[in-house]
């Protein structure tokens, strides 16, 4: 948080003098200063925990909430929805939600796109995490889970993105080990999914058997 009173520039005093010369008084009691707070960062608070079926997951080891996540407790089954994209453009059609109902469920999606290495790809503008979250939210998902491609190791950092905090549904990034553990319930792995989608250029989606995820997210 930033308190404007802690650093008043000289130009402010000049402006106040000019306003007074026109007979204009302060709008905030006896002062021309209007204090305000802005968010410049984000951090984990005390109530962050998760349970996958009956196994506890460790925050910052097995998963990490993302800065645009909502806070609260969310529990539900898990479905996998490819890259989490819903694109209907003249030059590109791709809908990872066409064959599944994600309402009131956790939707698990892979980061990036089938054309990750192509900076001019038509997928690029649809691939940011917060955009995939908005698609999931609009589809009625209870929350969104991001998993990494084979090229990525480790969890994403919890870093503040202006304008995207508390965007409506919980959003987390799972570790590679936990992601593969969940996918194995249906005979899949991150490698098999990524290679199949990228080779066929077709979405893969499915309901994940016998999987209930409960996550409490507490961000400040």
Residues covered by each model-derived region:
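Short, solvent-exposed loop/turn segments at the edges of secondary structure
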Residues: 74, 102, 139, 166-167
